[in-house]
Amino acid sequence: MDEVICDNRCMHTNVFLEGDQPEEACGVFGVYSNEPDFEASFLTYIGLYALQHRGQESAGMVVSDGSHVLAHKNMGLVSNVFNRDILEQLKGRIGIGHVRYSTTGSSLLANAQPLMARCSKGILSVAHNGNLVNPEELRQDLQENGSVFQSTTDTEVIINLIARHSQDDLPTAILKTAEVLRGSFSLVLMTKDTLIGLRDPHGNRPLCLGKLADAYIISSESCAFSSIGARFIRDIAPGELIMIDREGLRSFYLPKAKAEALCVFEYIYFARPDSNIDGINVHLSRKAMGRELAKQFTGKADVVIPVPDTGRSTAIGFAESSGIPYDIGLIKNPYIGRTFIQPQQNMRDLGVRIKLNPVEEVLKDKRVVIIDDTIVRGTTSGKIIRLLREAGAKEVHMCVSAPPITHPCYYGIDTSVRKELIASAHSVEEIRNYIQADSLTYLTIEGLYRALKPKEQLCMACFNGDYPIPVPGEKGNKYQLEEG
């Protein structure tokens, strides 16, 4: 038997809150060992836990013992999808895993990953972080040539393109596929005896390589290595394909070099603070953003507080630079999932109080600087400011560690509709008035560059409209493969 799909249909619904944060597409993880008794499923499970912040709609993994392929995926958090009994059934020395937030295709079990397909190379499994901007034309061409699709995700387009190159060896087939893909993609792929990692030629999404004894690990973020006791080796380069099998590790490269364009939101919001991405620690980068914000802030205040959790590092940097004391003024309910993960609006309108609670003794009669990472729609910001005033804050000054988001993202962030972006149609003063802050300070693009790295190495299209990967008609629709 080549394949067993374990799938208990135990559906789980997460109720999260309306938010002002953009949301990430996915997290991917892979592990390879030559040891026959290696427990790839347990390591993949822990790795996915470490990447849970990158997606909470579904989780899944595929493992192989070198001969047989086993898989399990379902809707919900990693802890809801897997248990000890399931993991013990998933025996293998090679594995890949995925946590998902939908940016192309609905939040459905059919779109949960990894996706699997039987082709000339055996069973091929793929997990994808990113978003294609040309999936419709690729899918139409595949359908005209006989491909039948079971999902509405762009990942199935990728796996069908690879399968079409049946005469080529696996790395060549994947590289040929990558040459026609337009958009953002960090992939982990698996056959019954091989693990592969591929990062798109712009390096728009992170992907890194680690090692645990003699086992190789591939992950969206380096924080997953620490969780399993592995050591970080290096970031996978833009346009690089890494193949791991019994012969060891080999690298292949896409033929045409592209300008590096890592998504700046990996540093601002998406990545865990203990991750390092392309040589920069996320926590330290956010502290640097806070120092730059403090230089711009012209008001006076008694206390600096973060919106938990991603505002914390920035608030520390702001406080250190400004001399204004740092404190905790909002407590986050640890049993409420990350803001904005569930994409349907009716799940966002439950209000902010169940998630955040003010510490009145810190706020009463104080001039408060509150640090947040982004303002997308402006909805939650206003509610938080109202919450602080009700707790006794005398003044509330909002400082944001990202510039105004004025343009949609088509590369894997769920902000592809321009009219949803408050800064696309309103001035800073209009937004300040809308959220009822005493002042509103956005970090400038120049300040963001100073905090991070040269502008030539970052994608900031959502701030300046400079799209490094051309977008056909500059039109985004996460349900584009469900229409027609």
Regions found by a protein language model. Name each.
Residues A178, D193-T194, G229-D235, R386-G484:
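PRPP-dependent phosphoribosyltransferase catalytic core
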Residues S151, E156-I159, Y326-G337, Y434-L452:
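A conserved beta-strand->alpha-helix junction
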Residues G323-V368, T379, T406-I413:
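Short, glycine/charge-rich flexible loops or terminal/linker lids adjacent to PRPP-binding catalytic cores
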Residues T103-T104, N134, N204-R205, F225-S226, ...:
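Flexible loop/turn segments at secondary-structure boundaries
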Residues D2-P238, M243-A301, V307, E395:
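Conserved short alpha-helical segments that host acidic/polar catalytic motifs at enzyme active sites
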Residues A127, M190, L198-R199, G210, ...:
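Generic beta-strand/beta-sheet core signal
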Residues K176, A224, R231, G239-E240, ...:
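Phosphate/diphosphate-binding loops
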Residues S147, Q167-D168, T298-D302, E320-D327, ...:
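Secondary-structure transition/capping motifs at alpha-helix termini
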